[in-house]
A protein has these predicted regions:
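N-terminal beta1-alpha1 ligand-phosphate binding loop
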Residues: 14-31, 43
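Cysteine-nucleophile active-site neighborhood
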Residues: 54-131
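Glycine-rich nucleotide phosphate-binding loop and flanking beta-alpha elements
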Residues: 23, 67-68, 147
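Structural signature of beta-strand start/N-cap positions in the alpha/beta core
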Residues: 13, 37, 58, 87-89, ...
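Catalytic beta-strand/loop cores that center a nucleophilic Ser/Cys/Thr
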Residues: 126-170
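Short, Lys/Arg-enriched N-terminal segments with co-localized hydrophobic residues
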Residues: 2-12
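Conserved strand-to-helix beginnings and helix N-cap segments that scaffold or border functional pockets
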Residues: 28, 72-76, 151
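A short beta-strand-loop structural module common to alpha/beta enzyme folds
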Residues: 37-45
Length: 170
């Protein structure tokens, strides 16, 4: 299932697609502390065939970035191609791209959230949030969300903010 994380160890290879965002390397450093075999590549500097040829690829991380998912280079195509084979974690723009790939629409949020903290209610039974309380605080830097009214049947909402907006999907 794309909702589960792989076990740790040096054989696990994670590819992070960088959507030209300054936060990418913060995420890279954190993931790298758990899974040392992580590679970052810009969204316009790799092909699907090159991704397919990576040895021991266990997961994809789609980084934050500016704009809408259609401006995220190979990100949406990578989600379409590998999303049913390996776990894909989308952060901000990556999260929105997952929503679009599975049939949802990305729309402006009710309010801009640039550098603001919010309480997020999560499904802590999902492996992504294992070990966390059912409410967490998260820093937010976005102005777009996955639309609730067009939310894809193939996905589940596993996190919402205090206004009910979708913050995490699986």
């Amino acid at each position: 299932s794309r909702c589960k994380c792989s076990e740790g160890g040096s054989k696990v290879m994670i590819l992070m697609i960088d959507n030209y965002d300054s936060f990418t390397y913060n995420v890279y450093q954190y993931i790298g502390s758990l899974y040392p075999q992580i590679q970052v590549v810009r969204n316009d500097e790799i092909t699907i065939d090159e991704i397919r040829n990576l040895q021991n690829l266990e997961a994809l991380v789609i980084s934050p970035g500016p704009g809408y998912p259609d401006s995220a280079g190979i990100s949406k195509e990578a989600i379409k191609t590998f999303g049913k084979e390996i776990p894909v974690l989308g952060i901000c723009l990556g999260h929105q791209a997952i929503g679009e790939v599975y049939g949802g629409k990305v729309v402006p949020a009710k309010e801009l959230m640039h550098g603001k903290m919010s309480e997020i209610t999560i499904n802590n039974k999902n492996p992504l949030f294992e070990g966390l309380e059912d409410k967490i605080y998260a820093a937010r830097y976005h102005s777009l969300i996955i639309d609730d009214e067009t939310f894809p049947e193939d996905l589940k909402v596993i996190g919402r903010d205090e206004k009910g907006q979708i913050m995490a999907v699986c």
